[in-house]
């Protein structure tokens, strides 16, 4: 079925006509109906876009936010199925935001122009009781301060429009770029008009969109946002950078911190490093966030990160570097003292991850890292370095005040000093209190106050100084006794000295308590003997429950710690602050050991409990298995007994049923037999009631006895009936024969007629077929000669073609066979030649060895003969002179000559060239053996015998 026709130009024309007659609401409604109609799904989005643009323009002008929202949702629902439709949705929403921003700007310009025209002389904007009361009854609220309602309504409309656009664009991979653009424009709207509440809702909305996108990563769906894509992740990261920047500009520090956490998590996911300028701006915002939070360590670390990135800026000047370096160093000096160890939970531990710091660094570590970093410390101004020297390196409480007041005016002249003056003042005052506690045992209040009273912005009242002193005592940096009557402060040198006196008092109190307990026990025993076993006596002797107080436990532990620390010789020689540090470290170590012991004990208890539970479970499982077996056995026995009873009952019922069925069959047969006998009409009738208790044979016998009376008469009747039936049958057949013959003649005549008709039809059909075939034959016979000629020519051409192909294939086959035969012959010849050469070499080697053996044998014989001859001469002429070895030398010479001749002969044979390959069969060589493939049988046999002989 074809889609319904769509005429966008008609809808536009209709809307223009309604607008021309000042019926804009009706025009808006007509466009709304057209956009939300289902038939637009069959049209291309480019056809519908002009209608939507016109609708949005008119809707924004009339401020119909709900109608626009519904229309946009319906439009997206109808066209989002295709990529072109999603592109159209993005274009429509961008146009919508353009219309809204243009309209808001025009309305704001109108409001400003109107406010300029209505200038009042009243400095308070014309807000007086009189015109305030009169404005209630007037339609035009022109009083200054009350004429912004229209503009506020347009701002609310703009905010709702931004929300609608973001909701339509969220979590769609095809609309990511448009979504990012609308997010940026929404932030600019909140910044421009200082809409803090709307900005909070925007931040929450963006966070929900990101959570939803992350949640849908593992689910299947079309156009899902892929957070593993680098471009997508970068867009989300850029949005969070803008969110941090806008939050800081609006002063929404909580939102800025949340956005910074989002930036941290997104940067962990991405592999693409953001731009240095973007990161520098981000860390600059973190500097302000941590400054407001009051955490100076985080503030200083953020400054360092910012300086590292800002140092890569080619446009930065040395003056800016010096200012930033001085600010960083001053912020580090403003970090509150953290000389004492503590185990409090750090609520800012999550914030350190934002700066890629695993654990919280100490104040000393932060300052030392800046001092060691030459790129920062070398650019710090002289006054700040001097402050570092007098505060950290060479602190002297007596001379500090003069040195500090000398550089204070220059420091106050710097623009960055105001942010750190309060925290720096607290650090300096805390150090002065610690110095005073170490140097003096007691000091007058006036002297103490004057030592920490500075000029200008560092000046505090006595009340504030006393608060600082109390706070230092709370933080355990000093311990003192304040005497306002004598106007002096007495510093305590040992933080645990009071617990020694407490311990002595506690020992006395414990002895008194023990004596009181013994007296109470005696009184209780006497009361028990007097009252016997009565209930009142039992209540009287009931032991009171002990009350354990936490303060008592703490005092006891501290007194034990004090006794332990007194054994350390260094404890008595150090200052109060060092004693507190030592005590805290000892307490922390003891607590850690206690916790470790508790953990081990709890783990051991858990293991024991687990083991007991396992054993209990195993025993329970075994018992349960035994119980289950017994229960199963009992159930089987009960089931077997029940089945036996049921089987017995079923057998009994079956027997009864068979008996009933047999009785019913018997009675039915008796009734049937009685009916049959009575139906024969032999003159004898038997009643059912007479024979119902009899058996079948008895009934038959009974009936036969009843019939025996008329037996003779019955036999006579039967014989007569048989004879009568025989004559009747013969009469029937005699009459029937002529009729049957007549019927057969009629059937024969009918068959002959049908046969003639059928034969005629077959003959006619055969003749017609023959004539048709003869006609075809005569028609084809005229062209038969041509057909035969064409056939012969085609057969000849075909045979000639196939003969050529066959001859070619035969030639190829023959050539291949010859090549293969030649290859096999050559291979066999080479194998035979190699084998013959090897055998020949072996024979020559054997011959050479035999000759060498023979020469050696002859040499041995000659040597033996010479030895025998020499021995004989020695025996016959013992005193004759020794004969020269001339004969032996001659023999050796001859032997060497023979060996050299044999070696030359063998070398000549081995150096002879190998025989050439066998020549063609047409020219065989007479002196060389024929190739293996061309030898005769006799030649092959002769060669074989030669090889066997050589072996």
Swiss-Prot record:
InterPro entries: EIF3A (IPR027512), eIF3a_PCI_TPR-like (IPR054711), PCI_dom (IPR000717)
Segments passing through the bilayer: none
Family membership noted in the UniProt record: Belongs to the eIF-3 subunit A family.
GO molecular function terms noted in the UniProt entry: mRNA binding; translation initiation factor activity
Basic and acidic residues: compositionally biased ranges: 890-906
Amino acid composition bias (Acidic residues), ranges on this chain: 505-538
PROSITE patterns named among the record's database cross-references: PCI
Annotated source species: Candida glabrata (strain ATCC 2001 / BCRC 20586 / JCM 3761 / NBRC 0622 / NRRL Y-65 / CBS 138)
Low complexity bias locations: 919-932
A biological process from GO: formation of cytoplasmic translation initiation complex
Protein name (Swiss-Prot/TrEMBL): Eukaryotic translation initiation factor 3 subunit A
Gene name tied to this protein: TIF32
GO cellular component: cytoplasmic stress granule; eukaryotic 43S preinitiation complex; eukaryotic 48S preinitiation complex; eukaryotic translation initiation factor 3 complex, eIF3e; eukaryotic translation initiation factor 3 complex, eIF3m; incipient cellular bud site; multi-eIF complex
Coiled-coil portions: 97-125, 496-532, 592-676, 704-779, 808-909
Sorted UniProt keywords: Coiled coil, Cytoplasm, Initiation factor, Protein biosynthesis, RNA-binding
Domain PCI residue range list: 298-496
Organism classification: Eukaryota, Fungi, Dikarya, Ascomycota, Saccharomycotina
